Amino acid sequence: AGNKGWGSVEIETMFAIGIIFIILFVIRELRMKSPMLNLEVLKFPTFTLTTIINMVVMLSLYGGMILLPIYLQNLRGFSALDSGLLLLPGSLIMGLLGPFAGKLLDTIGLKPLAIFGIAVMTYATWELTKLNMDTPYMTIMGIYVLRSFGMAFIMMPMVTAAINALPGRLASHGNAFLNTMRQLAGSIGTAILVTVMTTQTTQHLSAFGEELDKTNPVVQDHMHELASQYGGQEGAMKVLLQFVNKLATVEGINDAFIVATIFSIIALILCLFLQSNKKAKATAQKLDADNSINHE
């Protein structure tokens, strides 16, 4: 999609083929006695809703993890080590807060925990829409740590609550289904956000190109300054185009983070419909009992 465009025949054909195979896969799974993915888990509303929220969160999360290294290494000139070190504190925060978030899940339930975590994540993602070529390294690290702090209250509690909403006989099937959907959503999110970045970069590059009118006195002054530093007009134009390319790419990344923020807002809205732990468990037991009667 990044090279051909979403409206190209090749991409539309692949989408159509993918949808057809998904439909065939669902039909086959529903007819099998021992399916690869047991779709019976979708009969339980809390599991279904938490799975959808997980997928929407993954749309935002995975794409963001791809965009930041592109910004840091390709545009700002940081090494792969520096890029990894920037992301490291966020990962540590998630690991350290995981057990604490699990205890809070048992105490206050999933709904307030998820709303808090996704709200923090949404704010931090929005802050990443303001990147420029001079954004301090430590500022970016702080924003990413804040984003990871919010994620710590979402990831494990959301998975735990989803599995707890199922009867014991379906727990393993629910775990397999949830992990599959999370990975799928992460891949889709990466594709969407990278495509937004490349598409918007092209548009911004075109807009900046129109502003670089050589008859503009301001542009002429800058060209003369650059020409004196880089050995003539050709060197000056090369440096100027490199800078404009970087500037357009930064704006494209910011636009992609806007889309990631929208995904986070959607997840936040969906959290408002979550049930309490007790109600979700009671609903699961009732549905399981009804299904057992129907099977008999």
Predicted regions and their residues:
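Hydrophobic transmembrane architecture of multi-pass small-molecule transporters
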Residues: 182-276, 281-296
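Short, hydrophobic transmembrane alpha-helix segments
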Residues: 1-5
